[in-house]
């Protein structure tokens, strides 16, 4: 969640690059090529610029600028001998404006590289087979439906449903990647980016029997889940 008590506008930048093509937008189901200017857009389904697509799964209100920007390199650096000449370029900017003093604000989007606007429009309804399972302060999780691959970032202990009647719990912060077949887990990878934990303990729905150099499983037939300590 995005929170601030400051009387300053809070923004999340999606991208800011040189403008290299026309900007096409799907807004409330209507597709249009935008003229050069700055604007706020509501009910945006997707945006396309320079072979890159940006999908907004729930539709979103975003700010978009595709116009000339001017500035000096000397204004953004403390280095000496930097030219104070005014530079002018056409720039593409896409961002979320959360406003002043946002409370529990959030955002989500999908970036699709090397795609045409036509291809993006044809596949955006399915979000390119990507499902956002969770997007909270506790954890974030996405699943590629076609490849049956889940990725989860736990910021603290939490639980997420990764398939119908299949949940995964972690007792601490950590990250997990899960390859699935249907509702069954085929491969589970776990990491501790903080490198501070002595162990990570996971509980998954279903009964599994496996053992490795740094993990083992404890099936619980009564609860129909499996306890997986790792170190």
Predicted features, each with a name:
Residues 1-231:
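Terminal accessory/anchoring regions of large secretory-pathway or extracellular enzymes
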